[in-house]
Design a protein with these regions (language model features):
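C-terminal cap of thioredoxin/glutaredoxin-like
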Residues: 1-35, 154-230
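Glycine-rich, flexible loop/turn motifs
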Residues: 53, 137, 167
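Periplasmic c-type cytochrome electron-transfer domains
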Residues: 30-52
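Short secondary-structure boundary/capping elements
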Residues: 47-49, 79, 179
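Structural alpha/beta surface segment adjacent to cysteine/selenocysteine redox centers
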Residues: 67-73, 78-158, 188-193, 218-230
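A short beta-strand-turn-helix
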Residues: 47-64
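Conserved strand-loop elements at the edges of beta-sheets that form or border functional pockets
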Residues: 59, 68, 207
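A generic local structural motif
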Residues: 51-54, 83-84, 184-186
């Protein structure tokens, strides 16, 4: 390779590396201003999350808050999530469940698309309904190619009677992208390395079965001074 070719090659390499550094920096969302107390409570709508607040289920004035970081394609999530919701429903006067996206694309290639679908449904007031459908029917789309997966998701949107034009626009929107990226940044700050990961009043809690979920919630309720009626 002559000197001129080396110069051209070097310029190309520098440009590529510089571009990679730029992209990496752009993708590193800064949530350093969010402290640990805020991390374990509802985070409202703001520009970084596409003006989409945390999704809440249960008490609006909770004594116990469950933070769920999940990946819709994760088998463990599809088992644990309904149980966490069931326990929240049982103690709904005192317990709140907050869902945050944490799709792991390296092992679950359809997870982020599913997250976008749930967020798009949420923009039409149907987040939890879509959340339920995605988990309950995980086998129908988890290994599908993109076209088949999107057709399945569209059927869910139709089932929920969503405005399909808005749905189609929203799943590809910057708002939804920002929301998912923001949730993941919160998860990384929270120390999430795998899914599902649950925090009960800030404590990382193993959610391996419905009994352990309820036991952890009951313990937190007792610490908060809530009388539990059997």
């Amino acid at each position: 390779m002559n000197k001129k070719s080396w110069i051209i090659f070097s310029i190309i390499v520098v440009a590529i590396v510089g571009g990679m550094i730029y992209i990496s920096t752009q993708n590193r969302l800064d949530v350093s201003d969010i402290n640990n107390e805020q991390l374990n409570k509802t985070i409202g709508a703001e520009s970084r999350n596409g003006d989409i607040a945390d999704h809440e289920f249960g008490s609006k004035n909770p004594k116990v808050t469950i933070i769920e970081y999940a990946d819709y394609q994760c088998p463990g999530c599809s088992t644990a999530a309904p149980k966490a919701k069931e326990v929240t429903e049982k103690y709904k006067d005192s317990v709140q469940l907050i869902f945050r996206n944490f799709p792991i694309a390296s092992s679950h290639p359809n997870a982020r698309a599913a997250a976008a679908v749930a967020e798009a449904a949420g923009l039409q007031g149907k987040f939890w309904e879509m959340n339920n459908l995605l988990y309950a029917n995980q086998d129908a789309w988890k290994n599908a190619n993109a076209a088949d997966r999107d057709n399945v998701f569209r059927l869910y949107a139709e089932q929920l009677k969503l405005d399909l034009n808005k749905y189609k626009t929203d799943i590809a929107s910057s708002r939804v992208k920002h929301k998912i990226d923001f949730d993941m940044a919160l998860g990384r700050k929270h120390g999430v390395a795998a899914t599902p990961t649950f925090y009960i009043n800030g404590k990382n809690t193993e959610m391996d079965n419905s009994g352990s979920i309820e036991a952890a919630v009951k313990e937190a309720l007792k610490k908060a001074g809530v009388e539990i009626k059997n």
